[in-house]
Amino acid sequence: MSQYTIPHVIERTPAGERSFDIFSRLLNERIVFLGTEIDDGVANVVMAQLLHLQADSSDQEIGLYINSPGGSTTAMLAIYDTMQFLRPTIATYCMGQAASAAAVLLAAGTKGHRHVLAHSRTLLHQPSTQGNGTISDLALQAAEIMRVRSQTEAILSKHTGQTVERLRRDTDRDRIFTAEEAIEYGLADTLVAA
């Protein structure tokens, strides 16, 4: 998980003042913010927040706000599976960018509740890995990356309405979508204008 200074906010009530880090304050409003590369640590935090919000209220919407360059496919799939089995509506918002694994999470929000901000971008591409080891190890890694690619294409097909064949063609190289293009492609539903 990348490290940066986390701002605090002061909440004033008749009972006094309380200081919160900004992410705790957002969580109180049922907002989960994914603003870094997705790795196992980030996935664990996001999943814990989603599970907490469902336990808090299983009938209130959860907002997943995304500004991420993507990251680990296995970490993304852990978040994806968590999103799919939760009962609340999961509204997704692309702020800045939802690239690679993060684009899958954007598309995986509840249909009709997937939003992109006006100047955001979404990027799809095929999964990649860096191989090392013996030829036998490399063959196993290649088979695994092909399995993950097929799995990711099936997930995107389910949520976008695109065929697996089209997704395979479109993700052979980086495919960048403007906010409007992401909606046309089925990655999102609504443009949030400024």
UniProtKB/Swiss-Prot annotation:
Catalysis performed (reactions): Hydrolysis of proteins to small peptides in the presence of ATP and magnesium. alpha-casein is the usual test substrate. In the absence of ATP, only oligopeptides shorter than five residues are hydrolyzed (such as succinyl-Leu-Tyr-|-NHMec, and Leu-Tyr-Leu-|-Tyr-Trp, in which cleavage of the -Tyr-|-Leu- and -Tyr-|-Trp bonds also occurs)
Catalytic residue positions: S100 (nucleophile), H125
GO cellular component term of the entry, any: cytoplasm
GO function terms (MF aspect): ATP-dependent peptidase activity; ATPase binding; serine-type endopeptidase activity
Source superkingdom: Bacteria
Keyword field: Cytoplasm, Hydrolase, Protease, Serine protease
Gene Ontology terms: biological process: protein quality control for misfolded or incompletely synthesized proteins
Keyword Heme: no
The enzyme's E.C. designation: 3.4.21.92
Pfam families in alphabetical order: CLP_protease
PROSITE patterns assigned: CLP_PROTEASE_HIS (PS00382), CLP_PROTEASE_SER (PS00381)
Locations listed in the record: Cytoplasm
Keyword Hydrolase among UniProt keywords: yes
Quaternary organization: Fourteen ClpP subunits assemble into 2 heptameric rings which stack back to back to give a disk-like structure with a central cavity, resembling the structure of eukaryotic proteasomes.
Family the entry assigns: Belongs to the peptidase S14 family.
Record function comment: Cleaves peptides in various proteins in a process that requires ATP hydrolysis. Has a chymotrypsin-like activity. Plays a major role in the degradation of misfolded proteins.
Name this polypeptide is given: ATP-dependent Clp protease proteolytic subunit 4
Gene: clpP4
